[in-house]
């Protein structure tokens, strides 16, 4: 990234509103990434089947699916800051709930409740940052905000995984309860009490139908229905694959995920700014889709890694650890997935915010973005889990990669450039 782009991003943190959103987003993302690592450990601890491990993702996504439209509409007609604070308080309760998890069924329940806090914080935060960003710099604002998300998840992969490795579940969740509580106070103090620009003259259905008449929105929604199947399946089952097939500990799983997170943390802001400058945002999305499919299809190659990559032995805090060859294959795959996400995510968010502003419905547009994701996200983890039980991890990951490519074809077929509506 050039010096000018870096300086532009750093300048955003002088804005009190953006800084408050960034702090909140950092804590949220770090906790989320730590939970993803923990799910693989829980799957091993509770000796779950692939189906039950899939429920860890499906329970979370199903609740988000149910709530995404009403939450988005709330943002359009009421104070988005108030909703954001409610979601952050629920996040504290969720993290406290993880302290008491003692079975797979309890974990599924906590994951479902996490879906409530997650969708609330995600939609409110994204809508606010998209609307605060001035015209011409919105891609920079959105990209930098996503950059914070990526960097926070990178921190979760490393620091959160380290906490799980050294101090265990209960102490890790207690630390995140404290951090999340502090982030609530910071948002209350520094985020301006300004709702997202709203217009309550039409119904939720009317807003969504109006947005779907736009070809860009139609293409994005159709693509996200199937692409989310792949994305969420990888998110849940790559760590589970690493744990159950190769016995990797929390540090190694976190290290794998850190590869992709690091890529996103250093590139999304630049990609957002590049999109502002050159336009043609749909090309960024298409290239990202293809790269994601390739990275997903390569994941099963890890089972052959020891044939050409020797294990590496090292000592961590007095403990002897062996890094299997599969670690390096999975690390490379997740780096490739991180590059793909860097191309796709900031440009997609910018397109949804832009189209939402045309119709004074930023909240509904962002909620439509999430709604289109949640169906595949709900089905994907369980479907892939069943495939790992009945077939194999190879079949499951290849099926996910195929669906990602189909999503790209669908997007390319439906997308058309259109002028703003009259």
Give residue ranges: language-model regions:
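C-terminal membrane-cytosol helix-exit motif in multi-pass small-molecule transporters
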Residues: 177-196, 407-415
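Cytoplasmic helix-loop-helix junction between adjacent transmembrane helices
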Residues: 110-151
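Structural signature of the two symmetry-related core transmembrane helices
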Residues: 82-97, 283-298, 398
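Short amphipathic helix-loop junctions that connect adjacent transmembrane helices
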Residues: 37-51, 236-252
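Helix-breaking motifs and short loop linkers at transmembrane-helix boundaries and internal kinks
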Residues: 47, 79, 100-105, 247, ...
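Helix-to-loop junctions at the C-terminal end of transmembrane segments
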Residues: 67-79, 268-280, 388
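Conserved MFS/SLC helix-loop-helix module at the cytosolic interface between two early adjacent transmembrane helices
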Residues: 66-102
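Juxtamembrane intracellular "pre-TM" segments in multi-pass secondary transporters
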Residues: 2-15, 190-223, 244
């Amino acid at each position: 990234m050039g010096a000018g782009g870096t300086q532009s991003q750093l300048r955003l943190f002088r804005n009190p509103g953006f800084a408050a959103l960034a702090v909140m987003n950092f804590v949220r993302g770090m906790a989320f990434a730590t939970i993803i690592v923990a799910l693989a450990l829980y799957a091993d601890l509770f000796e779950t089947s692939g189906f039950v491990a899939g429920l860890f993702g499906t329970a979370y996504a199903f609740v988000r699916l149910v709530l995404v439209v009403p939450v988005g509409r709330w943002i359009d007609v009421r104070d988005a800051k108030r909703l954001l604070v409610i979601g952050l308080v629920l996040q504290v309760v969720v993290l406290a709930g993880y302290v008491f998890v003692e079975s797979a069924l309890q974990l599924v329940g906590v994951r479902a409740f996490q879906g409530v806090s997650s969708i609330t914080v995600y939609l409110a935060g994204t809508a606010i940052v998209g609307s605060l960003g001035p015209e011409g710099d919105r891609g920079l604002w959105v990209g930098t905000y996503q950059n914070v998300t990526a960097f926070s998840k990178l921190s979760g992969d490393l620091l959160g995984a380290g906490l799980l490795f050294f101090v265990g579940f209960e102490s890790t969740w207690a630390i995140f309860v404290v951090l999340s509580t502090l982030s609530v106070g910071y948002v209350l103090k520094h985020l301006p009490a300004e709702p997202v620009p709203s217009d309550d003259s039409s119904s939720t259905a009317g807003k969504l139908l109006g947005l779907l008449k736009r070809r860009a929105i139609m293409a994005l929604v159709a693509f996200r229905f199937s692409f989310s199947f792949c994305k969420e399946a990888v998110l849940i089952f790559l760590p589970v694959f690493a744990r159950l097939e190769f016995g990797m500990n929390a540090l190694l799983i976190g290290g794998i995920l850190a590869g992709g997170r690091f890529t996103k943390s250093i590139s999304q802001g630049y990609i957002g700014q590049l999109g502002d400058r050159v336009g043609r945002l749909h090309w960024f999305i298409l290239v990202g889709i293809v790269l994601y499919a390739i990275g997903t299809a390569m994941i099963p190659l890890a089972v052959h890694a020891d044939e050409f990559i020797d294990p590496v032995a090292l000592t961590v805090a007095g403990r002897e650890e062996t890094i299997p060859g599969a670690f390096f294959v999975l690390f490379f795959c997740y780096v490739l997935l991180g590059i793909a996400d860097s191309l796709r995510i900031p440009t997609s968010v910018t397109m949804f915010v832009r189209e939402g502003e045309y119709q004074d419905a930023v909240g509904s547009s962002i909620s439509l973005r999430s709604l289109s994701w949640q169906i595949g996200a709900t089905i994907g983890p369980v479907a892939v889990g069943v495939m790992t039980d009945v077939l194999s991890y190879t079949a499951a990951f290849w099926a996910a990669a195929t669906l990602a490519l189909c999503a790209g074809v669908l997007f390319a077929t439906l997308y058309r450039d259109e002028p703003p509506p009259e």
